[in-house]
């Protein structure tokens, strides 16, 4: 069953005696509004100028192919901040988690995520990010601490 925030919560009990919930959370814009930028080029006065955009801005400009394109027309360059081999390396995800929390950029499923952690429930993270499990785990451990 999914709620309005995209949170999936399941109960695998045939009787109501022993109830175990497990959760699946989509990270970006659901748990935290992350500051991670997408590297784009914006056509201004006939010249393509580098311009970084947020994930929410990307949702708007991605379909404007006349005025916006991926940096160097290369997805690897444009989305390098969403991987561990980008310019900030393996700490990129953790750094962005710290920034989002310090700026109180909590997204709609944040409270459910915290409740899940407090209750020791099993959960999974759904994401299009290319981070390895270890850096993502560091981000979750930072939240737990």
What are these regions (language model features)?
Residues 2-145:
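Alpha-helical substrate-recognition element adjacent to the catalytic core
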């Amino acid at each position: 069953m999914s709620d309005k925030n995209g949170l999936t919560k399941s109960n695998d009990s045939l009787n109501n005696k022993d109830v175990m919930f497990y959760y699946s959370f989509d990270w970006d814009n659901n748990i935290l509004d992350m500051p991670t930028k997408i590297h784009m080029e914006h056509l201004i006065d006939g010249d393509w100028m580098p311009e970084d955009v947020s994930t929410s801005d990307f949702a708007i400009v991605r379909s404007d192919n006349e005025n916006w394109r991926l940096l160097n027309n290369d997805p690897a360059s444009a989305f390098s901040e969403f991987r561990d081999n980008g310019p900030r390396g393996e700490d990129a995800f953790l750094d962005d988690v710290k920034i989002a929390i310090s700026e109180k950029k909590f997204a709609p499923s944040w409270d459910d995520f915290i409740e899940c952690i407090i209750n020791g429930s099993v959960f999974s993270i759904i994401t299009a990010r290319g981070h390895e499990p270890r850096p993502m785990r560091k981000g979750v451990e930072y939240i737990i601490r």
